[in-house]
UniProtKB/Swiss-Prot annotation:
Coiled-coil positions: 361-390
Binding positions (NADP(+)): 114, 236, 281
Name of the protein this chain belongs to: Uncharacterized oxidoreductase YNL181W
Record keyword NADP present: yes
């Protein structure tokens, strides 16, 4: 067909081509739209890596967007996945079975671990570490996160939601939970053999550039809730800074180990922050709709969707930078020039935008204060939990004694 059109234009002139004038007017707009869409979808990962026999902990895999796409690709390549979910209900069980069938990989499992609950995180980490010999672990892929509606100025103020531990939900889920999980799993990372390429890959967001760092109150327990965006951006910023310190600690501890008398470089365990780009994700839908179904239909689905389709990625296109971080040989020990945390955007390693990423003293203080405050909060919540348990037991005994007297 294109050859016939070109031949007609060359031999008989463009006047012989049907609807040529219409095509001439419309074509530039079509080409421009195609070019914008090609740019907005971002580059594709070109690396491949065999994952057979490798074991990964994965969060955010049930999102039906980027997380699901990454998990599907990893399962397809033969990886054993332990997927952490808030609940292991009927839907999650069916989803897991479907993923096994589609990828022909039976080594996909789901574990209950609510990342908004510090106690559940500690229970999971303790059960993971309570094994001899140490369990194999080739990486942790963190794609979970929470973004609360920003509210509408002068109409609808942002509503603060809290985790089970009383923390603001975005700080709890995006920062505290991931920090706590990875900090507790340090012994597992250090126990891996020197020839094992262990990759810890975490999702971040370009909005971190507008975040704040609360050194003295890193869990933001005493901060006023004026802006949901500020809490979200700060959670991502503090996560990135804390991971810089965690990487240094892991590297130094591994370097101090000796395997059969051989020195270790500590480069076999790497932490990478991935910025997948602006996607048409559940988070974006919640922000645009302000949590309203009516606004979701009118504003997102009808009015803004053509623009969003043109300038943003689909949730499944956002997986490319994650797959790049998982598969690129640039992060292998033999190719690493330094042990710093890497920042990946659009399938390439780029520099962090904030100057705080060069401040090691600030990162160390943030890490230490976060670790301290989490421990204090855990003790406080545990005391309350034990008090409630004791109260329930006493109430049960009283009711039993009363029923005996009545008999």
């Amino acid at each position: 067909m294109p050859l016939n059109i070109i031949g007609t234009a060359l031999l008989d002139g463009t006047d012989k081509i049907p609807y040529y004038q219409t095509i001439k007017k419309v074509a530039p707009y079509v080409l421009a739209t195609g070019a914008i869409k090609y740019w907005s979808r971002g580059p594709s990962n070109t690396w491949e890596r065999k994952l057979h026999g490798k074991v990964y902990l994965v969060t955010g895999a049930t999102s039906q967007g980027m997380g699901t796409s990454v998990a599907y690709k990893m399962a397809e390549l033969g990886a054993q996945l332990i997927i952490l979910t808030r609940e292991v209900d009927e839907w999650v069980t069916e989803w897991c079975e479907e993923l096994r069938e589609k990828t022909k990989n039976e080594l996909i499992f789901v574990e209950k671990c609510d990342l908004s609950n510090l106690w559940e995180i500690r229970k999971f980490a303790t059960s993971w570490l309570d094994n001899s010999p140490p369990r194999r672990l080739d990486g942790v892929i963190v794609m979970s996160g929470d973004m609360e509606p920003w509210g509408i100025p002068k109409i609808s103020l942002p509503q603060r939601r809290s985790s089970k531990d009383g923390l603001e939900l975005q700080i709890a889920t995006n920062y505290v939970a991931i920090f706590h999980l990875l900090n507790l799993l340090q012994p597992s990372f250090k126990a891996q053999p020197p020839d094992r390429d262990v990759r810890i890959i975490l999702a971040t967001c370009w909005l971190q550039v507008v975040g704040d760092i609360n050194i003295e109150d890193p869990l933001w327990q005493n901060a006023k809730y004026k802006s949901a965006l500020k809490f979200f951006a700060s959670s991502k910023l503090q996560l990135g800074l804390s991971m810089m310190e965690l990487q240094r600690r892991l590297t130094e501890d591994i370097k101090n180990q000796k395997t059969n008398g051989a020195e270790r470089t500590g480069k076999n365990v790497t932490i990478t922050m991935v910025q997948p780009g602006t996607m048409r994700s559940n988070s974006l839908r919640r922000v645009i709709s302000n949590g309203s179904v009516v606004l979701l239909i009118i504003l997102y689905c009808i009015l803004l969707y053509p623009i969003l389709w043109l300038f943003t990625k689909s949730g499944r296109r956002g997986d490319q930078s994650f797959l790049y971080a998982l598969m690129t040989p640039e992060l292998e020990e033999v190719n690493l020039k330094d042990t710093k945390v890497k920042y990946i955007s659009d399938c390439s390693i780029v520099k962090f935008a904030r100057k705080e990423f060069d401040d090691e003293e600030l990162q160390k203080k943030l890490f230490d204060n976060t670790e301290r405050d989490i421990l204090q909060l855990e003790k406080k919540v545990a005391a309350k939990r034990n008090a409630n348990k004791t109260g329930n037991q006493n109430s049960k005994k009283k009711s039993q004694n009363k029923s005996r007297k009545d008999d």
